[in-house]
C-alpha cells in the first residue's frame, strides 16, 4: 500500500472510536522539530524531541507527537488518540548518536515510511537546545518544518512537504499525490 493510500485510510478513520494514546505532551525538556497541518482546521500535530541537559536525545524513544489545539487557544494541547497513531504516529525511531553537546535520531512516520526524518540536536551559541529535522524534499535534503495534508471529501487529496534548503536561502516544497 502506498504511503498516500495509507494516509488516506488512516485519516478517514479519525472520526471513529476515541481512546487516549500514551503520547507525551510538551514539557520543559522537549523541543519542537516539525508539524503536520490539515486543511480542515487550524489544529496541528507537533513533533518534539526530548533532550537531556547536554541537548542529547533522552532515552531510547525521544521523539513524540501531540496535538496543538489552536482552534481552542494558542497554548492548548492534547495527546494523539490511539486511532490517530496510524496516521500521525511513528513507525520507528532509533537514536544514532548521543554526544556531550547533542545527538541524532532517525524517525520514520507511519504515513511516510519511505521518507525517514533525521533529527539533529545541538546546543546553540545562546546555550539553548535545538532540534532540526532533515528529510528528502523534491529529491534533495532539506530542513523539514511542515507536512500539509489537503483533505477532500473522501480522504487525502495531497500532502505538501515543506522545508528550508540546506543553506537556508529558500523554502523547498514537494507535493505528493496518489
Please provide the spans of the model-predicted regions.
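Sec-dependent N-terminal signal peptides
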Residues: 4-14
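N-terminal signal peptide c-region/cleavage motif recognized by signal peptidases
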Residues: 16-18
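N-terminal export/targeting and maturation segments
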Residues: 21-83
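Hydrophobic beta-strand residues in large extracellular and virion-surface proteins
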Residues: 36, 49, 96, 107, ...
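Mature extracytoplasmic domains of secretory-pathway proteins
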Residues: 60-140
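Beta-sandwich interaction modules
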Residues: 139-150
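Short, exposed beta-strand-loop hairpins at the edges of beta-sheets
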Residues: 149-174
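Short, solvent-exposed mixed-charge patches
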Residues: 177-178
Amino acid at each position: 500500500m502506498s504511503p498516500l493510500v495509507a494516509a488516506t485510510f488512516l485519516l478517514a478513520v479519525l472520526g471513529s472510536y476515541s481512546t487516549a494514546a500514551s503520547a507525551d505532551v510538551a514539557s520543559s525538556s522537549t523541543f519542537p522539530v516539525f508539524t503536520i497541518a490539515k486543511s480542515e482546521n487550524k489544529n496541528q500535530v507537533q513533533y518534539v524531541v526530548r533532550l537531556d541537559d547536554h541537548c542529547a536525545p533522552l532515552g531510547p524513544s525521544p521523539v513524540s507527537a501531540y496535538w496543538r489545539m489552536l482552534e481552542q487557544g494558542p497554548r492548548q494541547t492534547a495527546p494523539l488518540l490511539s486511532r490517530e497513531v496510524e496516521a500521525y504516529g511513528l513507525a520507528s525511531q532509533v537514536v544514532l548518536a548521543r554526544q556531550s553537546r547533542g545527538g541524532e535520531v532517525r524517525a520514520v512516520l507511519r504515513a511516510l515510511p519511505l521518507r525517514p526524518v533525521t533529527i539533529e540536536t545541538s546546543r546553540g551559541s545562546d546555550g539553548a537546545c535545538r532540534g532540526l529535522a532533515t528529510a528528502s524534499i523534491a529529491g534533495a535534503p532539506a530542513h523539514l518544518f511542515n507536512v500539509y495534508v489537503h483533505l477532500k471529501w473522501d480522504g487525502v487529496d495531497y500532502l505538501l512537504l515543506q522545508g528550508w534548503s540546506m543553506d537556508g536561502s529558500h523554502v523547498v516544497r514537494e507535493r505528493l499525490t496518489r
